[in-house]
Every structure is written in C-alpha cells, then in structure tokens.
Design a protein with these regions (language model features):
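Hydrophobic alpha-helical transmembrane segments
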Residues: 46-50, 77, 81-82, 118, ...
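Alpha-helical transmembrane segments of multi-pass integral membrane proteins
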Residues: 49-56, 87-91, 128, 232-236, ...
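Membrane-helix interface segments
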Residues: 5-6, 42-44, 73-82, 113-114, ...
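Membrane-interface helix starts
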Residues: 6-10, 40-48, 217-231
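Transmembrane helical segments that form the transport core of multi-pass membrane transport proteins
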Residues: 216-267, 275
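Transmembrane helix-loop-helix hairpins in multi-pass inner-membrane proteins
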Residues: 1-36, 87-199, 277, 281-340
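A short amphipathic helical element positioned immediately N-terminal to and/or at the very start
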Residues: 32-38, 208-221
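Membrane-embedded helical hairpins/re-entrant loop segments and their flanking transmembrane helices
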Residues: 59-85, 89, 247-264
C-alpha cells in the first residue's frame, strides 16, 4: 500500500513537472514578456481567478448531484464534490484511463453498484456535451455577425470546427440513448480483424458500451433530470467562459467585450472537446492562442492563457490531489479494518 501511495506522489509530481516543462518550451520566445505581464497582475485578480476556477468545479458537482439524487437521494453535495475532484485527478494522472474507475469506486463505497456509478458519470458527460453545443449555438447565433466582420478568415475555420464538434456531440448522445446507433457501432466492431487479440478487444469494448448505454438511458431519458442537468450545465459554462475574460483583462487586453469572449470561449470548448489530448493538455492551449491572439499580441494572449490554465487546470488539480489522498487514506483504513 505504501508503494502505491509513493507511485501516486511520483505520478502527480511528474505530471506537473512535464506540463511545466512543456509550457516553458512552448512560450520560450515570449517568456520574458509573459513574466513581465504576470508580475503586474494584482493579488485580488489571482484570488478572483481561483474563485471562479473553484466555482466551475462546484457547479460541475451540482450537476453530478442532480444525477446522483435520481439514484441515491441521501448523497450530499460533498459527495458530489469529491467525485468531481477524483475525476480531475484521474483525468490528469492516468491520462483519462482511471477517471471512471476512481469515480465509480467512490460511488460504490456510498452504496451504488458499479453499473449505476458508470451510468451516472456517463450521463454527466453527455449532459455536459449537450450543454456545450447548446451554449455555442446560441452564442454563435447572437454574435456570428460580429465574428464574420471582425475576423472573417478565422470565422470560416471556426464554423467548420463547430460543425464537426456538433456532429460528434450528437453522435455521442445518440450512442448513449438510442439502441439503433449502439447496434450500428457493435456491427462495425464485427468488421475488426478476426484474431484472438482483436476478438478480446471487441468483446470488451462491446460489453462496456452496452453497459454504459443501459445505465445512462436510465438517467438521460428522465425529463426532470435532463432539464435540470442542462440548466445547471449552462450556468456552469457561463462561469467557465467568464474566466478567459478576466484573464485577458488582467493581462492587459481590453479589445474584447464580455459577450465576445463568451462567444469565442464557447467555440473554443466545443472544438477542442472533439480533439484528442494528453491529460487535458494540448488542443485547449492551441485554440486559446488561435482565437484570442487576433485581438491581443502574442505575449498578452500567452499571459492570459497561463492565468486561465492556473484557474482551470493547475488549481483544480492541486485540490484533486488533496481529495484523492484523503479518500485513499479512508480506503486504507477500511482495508486494514477488514484484514484485522
């Protein structure tokens, strides 16, 4: 058990170190300017950014609680908050592979079977994706003319990214809620090579999808849960999209209004959600600079990106490490008690 905890510390430390090194390499040309810009950021501004970052995770926990209450009404907001931060920890330290197992294990300890736990987390993921699409669509309808007039070249690529992101969200939603789409995917699995290795993978992937579809449908097809979940998600996204605006202002960019940053941020999340990433890093940073550099020079946009990721990535990860270690300690106590 001690070796397992040591590995946890090592993985957490290495993850942060690698990300820090990557940031240094990416921004090495403008690093002096970034340091200069960040040195002028007031302390209250940093605190407000961190508060918004925590508020986003708290709203994510409210969404989780809405879904959990459908299965287990006695679960509390603190339970949902722990599930959320365990997800943050698993996504970063295990490159996403351990996210669902960590969250499902916690829910299992709270009295939910493994299938229900997986269904809850899958439902939360789908509701989040649906809300991202709704928010981006409304923002684009309201601000599309401004985007076309102020950045026509960029708008063309953003529209393509929007369409691709929308198609992925729709396909994902149908996969979890419509049996015909699930049957189609399972049929495609049968086209994979007929070898022992691929047969094992096909069986594993197919059974996982069937289980997720079965459990997620129990939640997603309940109107009250669906409506409340999307409402909470939209409010959560409003908080998230407010962080780039504050980061840009603190870095010295005043060319964009609050509504314009909301539009660009909503498109940024929709597009990057459809792209592969490593531990939540890569596409988001690229998209942030691509979208906001036209209205701020590279150094200011890069400084704003650092502030944004501190609030939405590093700070939540730090909190998630604390939550994980506390939950691991409780698990070890329970294991020792059973052994005795």
């Amino acid at each position: 058990m001690k070796s397992k905890r040591s590995r946890t510390y090592l993985v957490s430390g290495l993850t942060l170190a690698l990300i820090f090194v990557a940031i240094i390499l990416v921004f090495r040309d403008v690093l002096p300017d970034i340091v200069k810009d960040l040195s002028t950021v007031p302390f209250w501004g940093v605190l407000l950014l961190l508060a918004l970052g925590f508020a986003y995770e708290a709203m994510e926990s409210v969404l989780c609680l809405v879904i959990i209450h459908h299965k287990k009404p006695d679960c509390t907001f603190i339970d949902a908050l722990r599930v959320t931060f365990l997800g943050v920890f698993g996504n970063i330290t295990t490159l996403g592979a351990g996210t669902l197992p960590m969250q499902s294990f916690y829910l299992y300890r709270r009295g939910l079977d493994a299938g229900s736990g997986l269904g809850i987390m899958a439902s939360e993921y789908v509701l989040h994706k649906i809300s991202v699409l709704i928010y981006a669509t409304v923002a684009l309808l309201l601000g599309g003319d401004w985007l076309e007039q102020s950045a026509s070249g960029l708008a063309r690529y953003l529209l393509i990214g929007y369409v691709i992101g929308a198609l992925i969200v729709i396909a994902l939603t149908l996969l979890y809620t419509w049996d015909k789409v699930l049957d189609l995917v399972l049929l495609l699995f049968k086209k994979l090579p007929d070898t022992p290795k691929w047969n094992e993978r096909r069986e594993k992937w197919g059974s996982s999808l069937v289980q997720l579809n079965t459990e997620a449908r129990k939640v997603l097809l309940v109107p009250s849960v669906r409506v409340r979940g999307i409402a909470v998600s939209l409010l959560k996204l409003f908080v998230l999209y407010s962080i780039p605006y504050l980061a840009l202002r603190l870095a010295g960019c005043t060319a964009l209004s609050f509504a314009e940053v909301q539009l660009l941020s909503s498109l940024m999340l929709l597009i990057t959600s459809a792209l592969p990433n490593v531990a939540g890093v890569g596409p988001m940073e690229f998209a942030f600079l691509l979208l906001f550099t036209p209205w701020a020079d590279t150094a200011i946009a890069s400084s704003a990106l650092v502030l944004y990721r501190v609030a939405t990535y590093f700070f939540p990860f730090l909190l998630s490490v604390i939550v994980f270690l506390r939950e691991e300690k409780k698990s070890l106590k329970g294991f020792d008690a059973q052994s005795a």
